Amino acid sequence: METESVWAYPRPPRLEKTKTLLVGEFGGILVETRDAFRVLETSHPPTYYLQAEDFRENALTAVSSSTFCEWKGEARYFDIQAPNGKIATRAAWDYPSPSNNFLKLQGFVAVYPSKVERCFVDGEEVSTQEGDFYGGWITSRIQGPCKGGPGTLGW
């Protein structure tokens, strides 16, 4: 597969359908799907939005927390619960009423790889994006440096 530079991604961000096999683990398989989108934005590794229906039943619990993205709109957050009762706080988010350019994200959920046990893109375990705000999935195909770490929020 070809490498991608995060500096070649557009701003405003681009929404792209993907059939890549995506897997998230938290107390077993949390989600496994080929029904997903990825958002590509300058300086950011891809953020994957996975079909909500493909998550393990009762894994996502909406919490009273939100943020606003200038491109996608208001995000709603979820805690993720493992079968053993372990909880990952604010570990996923979605856009219940996304802006016009991102309407296709309705019904799709993104996961912070740093808050669950492991995430995979086509069998490759991802690295997490630095910081605690962005939820990019970094594979060996992604070339940085990536926004998120100390001193990069103004990029």
Regions found by a protein language model. Give the residues of each.
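Terminal leader/tail segments of proteins
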Residues: M1-W155
